[in-house]
A protein has these predicted regions:
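Sec-dependent, cleavable N-terminal signal peptides
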Residues: 1-2, 622
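Tryptophan-rich substrate-binding surfaces of secreted polymer-degrading and adhesive proteins
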Residues: 2-233, 434, 511, 516-525, ...
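Conserved, function-critical positions that sit in or immediately flank catalytic
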Residues: 190-622
Length: 622
């Protein structure tokens, strides 16, 4: 019994984490308030502003209860470290106790990441196949231009497993490049078919890229034009079996597949139209067509009635016409009279720029009646062997399909046909939504990058001393109830005079304090470490502290404090006076030990400087 965890499960897990960074309740509440105010006016409800506020409050309460939002922060901690961190409760709490500063993270700081593979000539790339585990296929490539922008392509056809020798073109709408209707790029040299997916700007890549991955564009999550044009179509039709030279009676002229023909269709320049008529001399619609051919040397035409039905008359402007009847009408066997089913005018067939071929008809079933049908035709080589299936229209709204080669009576009546193994075709259906509609699912993106910057130019990020750890925390609590976009968590003691000579960075500030409780008066030592000390040049010194700790309340009181080289040192500085602890001591806003640490890392001490910026990047790979 097989048990398989699909790539969808991994992607869904990634989606859930990504979506948890997206907070929309405030927008929903605001939109509701706007709609309520409009309805109040148009329906003459006479609700006061206060009543509308109360009603909106009900909605906000329900949103908070039924759709709780998460807040994420990347925080820096610990000016030094005694050991490498480990995944233990002690280490996580030690990080939370020693938080120094942090930034709030939103969905703008998060990117889906995908594996980037640079296109390399001579590589055999996998083409999309709905019977294969697509997460294991090497079918996505990256092309990088001179500006450093990255263009992502998906292989739809690989020329029956041939090597790719021509890079997909990044130009949209240019002849031989990306078709602006389908966003497919067809290589005329190696017969590869590529689907343009999206591009990644150089600036985005510089911020989020890793050694082997690039970020999905935000907020479009792909290319909006490609996504809107995507259809649930036939991706390709594979030939799983076909007899050699099956269509030898249908090879006219040179009978070769030219490398300069981007459609990969049979070149047969000697097929021309001798005459085009309607049902009557005055009928403008084409009906009866006389085709002049040059038979391949040594070959012959089948003179039987309707021998060339079940073929298409192909026209180089992307049209095919079903041949209803056929008759070989000349003694030399170079003329075929056919009737076709079309609403096109006779004039459209006499355009001098038109070229024509007779090609095998491929019939593809439909999943639903409302979708556009797939119109496909066969490509034969100079021997008349079916080698490829090409398309006029790949159709839409396909979930499942079968494909069948329609045989002209002249082919099926040939000697020895009954002993041949029948041609077998397999229709490959595009993913749900169509190629390019959902890059996250199509590329099995189960990796997220979370980015923030700590800059010395930011007002709330310290521009001195060190930090040795960073972590991503979910739902930390702040003392004042806010959710700041950035915070400095250092405690600050303001004292009179210039005390910078006493407040030595790295030393400890201690104070013995008395506490009254149910067991009488108890004492504790409040200890913190000096992060920096700044004299304002006139009256006061601000002493910035980290690692504030004590047995009970962890707060300084009005009175003297002392600076020591270590907390237990007998030797202390001259006393420094806190005149009014209520006003002169300010503690960090982050409530210690709150928030769930999802990821944390330690490193050698990083020095904070005013002209320095550190980029912090977490990669989550599911």
């Amino acid at each position: 019994m097989a048990k398989i965890i699909t790539e969808n499960f991994k992607v869904e897990t990634t989606n859930e984490l990504f979506n948890s960074f997206v907070n929309t309740n405030a927008t929903v509440g605001s939109n509701f308030a706007t709609s309520l105010a409009t309805y109040n006016t148009t329906s003459s409800l006479s609700l006061s502003s206060a009543q509308q506020t109360v009603i909106k409050g009900f909605v906000d309460t329900q949103l908070a209860s039924l759709k709780p939002e998460s807040d994420y922060y990347i925080m820096g901690s610990s000016i030094d470290k005694a050991n490498n961190i480990s995944n233990t409760q002690h280490e996580k709490r030690d990080f939370q106790r020693r938080v120094i500063f942090g930034n709030k993270i939103t969905d703008d700081d998060v990117r889906y990441m995908f594996k980037s593979t640079t296109w390399t000539s001579g590589t055999i790339y996998d083409d999309f196949d709905d019977t294969q585990d697509v997460s294991l296929l090497n079918m996505f490539v990256t092309i990088t231009n001179s500006e450093g922008n990255h263009y992502i392509f998906k292989c739809l056809e690989n020329n029956n497993g041939g090597p790719s020798t021509v890079a997909p073109s990044i130009n949209v709408g240019v002849a031989g490049s990306v078709d602006p209707n389908t966003y497919e790029s067809v290589s005329s040299s190696d017969s590869y078919v590529w689907k343009y997916m999206f591009s990644v700007t150089n600036s985005d890549a510089q911020i989020y890229s890793t050694s082997d991955s690039l970020p999905l564009p935000y907020p479009a999550y792909g290319d909006s034009l490609v996504k809107s044009a995507a259809k649930e179509s036939i991706s390709q039709v594979l030939i799983t079996n076909t007899p050699n030279s099956l269509f030898s009676k249908c090879v006219f002229g040179p009978g070769t597949v030219t490398s300069s023909d981007p459609t990969g269709t049979l070149t047969s320049s000697t097929v021309t139209l001798e005459a085009v008529t309607g049902d009557s001399p005055t009928d403008p619609i084409a009906k009866n067509i006389r085709i002049k051919i040059s038979p391949k040397p040594g070959a012959f035409l089948d003179t039987a009635s309707n021998a060339y039905t079940n073929l298409y008359l192909w026209r180089n402007d992307g049209e095919v016409y079903d041949i209803i009847t056929s008759t070989v009408s000349s003694a030399t066997g170079d003329l075929i009279d056919v009737t076709i089913d079309t609403t096109h005018t006779k004039a459209s067939f006499t355009n001098g720029a038109r070229t024509y071929m007779l090609v095998p008809k491929i019939e593809v079933s439909r999943s639903v009646s409302t979708g556009n049908p797939c119109i496909a035709y066969g490509v034969i080589d100079r021997f008349g062997t079916l080698v490829k299936v090409s398309f006029i229209d790949k159709g839409s709204k396909y979930k499942y399909a079968t494909a069948e080669l329609k045989l002209p009576p002249g082919v099926s009546a040939a000697s020895g046909f009954a002993s041949l193994t029948p041609t077998a075709l397999r229709a490959v259906v595009s993913p749900t939504g169509g190629h390019g509609s959902n890059p996250v699912n199509e590329m099995s993106m189960s990796r997220l990058a979370v980015i923030t910057n700590f800059s010395g130019e930011d007002l709330l990020i310290p521009d001195s001393n060190f930090y040795t750890k960073v972590a991503l925390l979910k739902n930390p609590i702040f003392v004042d109830g806010t959710k700041p976009t950035q915070f400095d968590n250092r405690a600050v003691i303001t004292v009179a005079g210039d005390k910078t000579s006493l407040a030595i960075v790295g030393h400890y500030v201690t104070q013995e304090v008395s506490l009254s409780g149910g067991n009488g008066t108890e004492s504790e030592t409040v200890v913190s470490r000096i992060h920096s000390a700044v004299y304002d040049g006139s009256s006061n010194t601000k002493i910035y502290l980290v690692d504030v700790s004590g047995n009970f309340q962890n707060i300084y009181q009005t009175g003297n404090i002392f600076v020591r080289a270590n907390p237990n040192s007998v030797t202390a500085s001259s006393p420094i006076s806190i005149n009014n602890a209520s006003n002169d001591v300010v503690y960090g806003n982050y409530s210690p030990y709150t928030g769930e640490i999802l990821h944390f890392v330690d490193f050698d001490p990083i020095q904070r400087q005013q002209d320095r910026k550190e980029k912090i990047k977490f990669i989550f790979d599911f």
